[in-house]
């Protein structure tokens, strides 16, 4: 993924264009596939259909949205056969109960909430994320690991600061060691639980969030969302403003699917 627009990352040098390098946002494998297809060769692709990271209930979302042709299947690894997320400490309230049984959860947030300091923060989502981290930390008991249990994905570094501030209030001992980072820096990583604060306060920010999208075989592929949804092994939790997110067909479809197959839950702090 890249931060530049298609125009900014375009390559105009003829010598590079001749060898298939047309845009710096295109990966090596995208260039190889395009080169082979333009040469009308079809026996160059091998598709991996088994994955050992995501529980099937989580993989179903990325599979339906981005990998329908590949039909991803679990290896299966032990955690992929578990019926429930499985926290050893009993739930204390309704949200704990949801965390104990649901694999994919969406919690709607309020618009803005940065106190006028920046449009790249959302205080409501920061409180939600910190509360979720504290709950999972408590319910995981002795099995909790800052390096393995939880990761938090956000689009803006300003939001990282706000979330850490809220975490220091709710789970001060673990706050510095839990990874909170942008989706670009989360590529290649995984955690048992991924919490994503989408932090969109305007239509313009929704455009930024979905900027790394392209169309393939009539389907819109959102690179950032794809990476986000495929980082979690056991549980995926998202929070964002549904009114703004509905402006994207991809996010509107995701929220509708969560309403149907996961858990769309309002929670006020």
Question: Language-model features: where?
Answer:
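Conserved helicase motor core of SF1/SF2 NTP-dependent helicases
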Residues: 1-269
């Amino acid at each position: 993924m890249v931060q530049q627009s298609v125009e900014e990352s375009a390559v105009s040098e003829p010598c590079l264009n001749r060898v298939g390098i047309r845009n710096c946002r295109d990966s090596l494998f995208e260039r190889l596939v395009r080169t082979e297809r333009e040469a009308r060769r079809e026996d160059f692709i091998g598709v991996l259909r088994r994955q050992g990271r995501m529980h099937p209930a989580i993989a179903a979302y990325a599979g339906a949205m981005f990998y329908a042709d590949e039909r991803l299947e679990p290896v299966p690894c032990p955690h992929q056969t578990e019926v429930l997320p499985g926290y050893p400490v009993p739930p204390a309230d309704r949200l704990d109960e949801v965390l104990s049984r649901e694999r994919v959860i969406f919690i709607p947030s309020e618009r803005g909430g940065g106190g006028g300091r920046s449009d790249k923060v959302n205080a409501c989502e920061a409180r939600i994320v910190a509360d979720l981290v504290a709950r999972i930390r408590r319910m995981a008991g002795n099995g909790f690991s800052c390096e393995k249990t939880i990761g938090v994905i956000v689009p803006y570094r300003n939001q990282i600061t706000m979330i850490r501030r809220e975490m220091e209030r709710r789970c001060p001992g673990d706050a510095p060691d839990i990874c909170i980072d942008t989706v670009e820096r989360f590529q290649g990583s995984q955690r048992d639980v991924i919490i994503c604060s989408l932090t969109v306060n305007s239509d313009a920010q929704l455009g930024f969030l979905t900027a790394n999208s392209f169309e393939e075989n009539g389907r819109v592929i959102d690179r950032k969302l794809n990476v986000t949804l495929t980082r979690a092994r056991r549980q995926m939790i998202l929070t964002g403003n549904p009114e703004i997110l509905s402006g994207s067909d991809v996010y509107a479809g995701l929220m509708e699917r969560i309403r149907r197959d996961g858990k769309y839950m309002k929670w006020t702090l």
